[in-house]
Amino acid sequence: AESLGFPLIKMELPKEPTMEEYRELMSKTMNDLKSRGITHSIFGDIFLEDLKKYREDQLHSIGMEGVFPLWKINTADLIREFLDLGFKTIVTCVNETYLDKSFAGRIIDEDFIKDLPENVDVCGENGEFHTFTFNGPLFKNPVEFEIGEIVKKTYPKPKSDENSKDDEYVFWFCDLIVK
């Protein structure tokens, strides 16, 4: 946040929050921001309609609006523009359903894109992977970090997930240690 010139507002979550705990904490945080005069929240969602609707519904319930500047942009075009502009991003989490451990901790570049299986969105828009952007044209300075451990974590799947043959989700997380 400092490198981008924004204040950092933290929302502390319990180690493994329930959706209800998450909703309550998010509502409290957003209401606090609203009391400071903030009326909109910006999201990087691209094409998941249900997620966009969820975010809009949650914001509308407290009188705020969501802004989705990347909505419906072709992800192949978006990642090319992102890289061409000079943004630097590292993969911090991969969903083992789509990608193996070797993708955690990789920098997103042309080689990364070429190595992605065909069923994986290049922006990870279906939850295949998550990232941290540490440098680019909007940054005053790069965020300096070292790569820490790559850790496997499992989470139970909801009983409603009938399409799944496994009982749990498996994710690989790459710890980043800020210098």
PLM feature spans:
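Nucleotide-activated chemistry modules centered on ATP-dependent adenylation/adenylyltransferase
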Residues: E2-K179
